[in-house]
C-alpha cells in the first residue's frame, strides 16, 4: 500500500511538472483606444509617451535599435555602453549570460518575444534567452535595422548579401528561417535586391518589404511584387533608386507597406502602400524630405510613424498617424521605433 501511495504521488508530480512545461503563447486582450499607451524610442535611448513627455532615459544606452511590447511590458534592443549583451525591460537592463566563442562587438539589430523567450539578433548569432543559434552562411550578410521577428516560436531574420551562385557583385534579398538561409526570388533580369521590413504571423507566414533594383517591393509568402510609384521614372532624373519599403504589417487581410518614394524634385516623400496602392503622408509643413519609418497594427487599428526633415538644418519632426489621420507631432524627436501597449 505504501508503494502504491508513493507511485501515485510520483505520478501526480510528473503530471504537474509536464503541465508546467507546456506554456501556451500569451494572448493579450485588445485594449480600447483610450486605455492604450504609445511609446517611442530614440536612437540615444529616450522613451517618450504619446503626448511627447519623456518617460525614461534608458540607463547605459549607447544606441537603442527597436522597441516591442507584450501586454503591459516593453522591451528595447540596442547597444549597452558597458559592452554587455542583453536588453532593457520596462527601462531596466537585463543581461543575457551567454558564453560566446568569438570575441566580437555586440550590436543587436532586432528583438522578438514568444512565450517566455526573448530573441536578440546579435550578428552572427540569434540569442534565445541564454542559447546561441548561429546563422547559416552569415558572411557578407547585412541585416536590416529591424531584422528579426518571431511567430509562435519560429524565428525569421532578413537583410541582404552576396550569392555564390550568382557572384555579380550585387546584393540579393536574404531570409533566414530558423537560422537557415535562402535568397528570395526576383523578376527575371533584376540584378539587386534588399530586405528592410519583416512581419511574421501564424507561425509559417511572412510579409517582407524592401527594394528590387530601384523599385519598392514586397514579398508575400516569398513571392515578390513590385509596387507602383506616383512619379513616372522619366521625371526623376538619374536617381539611384525610386523608392523603398521600410516597414510592413497586416490588418484585416490588407497589407500595409510604409516607406518613401522620390518626387520630381528629388525629395523623399513619406508613402504608405495599402494592398499596393500608394498614398503620401505629409503633415502640411514645408519639408525637404520625409519618410514613413514604422507601421504596426493593433486590433483593427493601424499606427504609423513618419519623420519630416526641414532644410539644411538638423530640425526634424516625427508624426504619429492612426488609421490615416495625423494625431500627434513631436518636435525635434528622432524616432528609431515605437510600440503600443
Give short role names for the model-derived ranges.
Residues 17-20:
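C-terminal motif of bacterial Sec signal peptides marking the signal peptidase cleavage site
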Residues 23-341:
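Residue-level hotspots at or immediately adjacent to binding/recognition sites across diverse folds
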Residues 6-11:
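Sec-dependent N-terminal signal peptides
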Residues 1-5:
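Positively charged n-region of N-terminal signal peptides that target proteins for export
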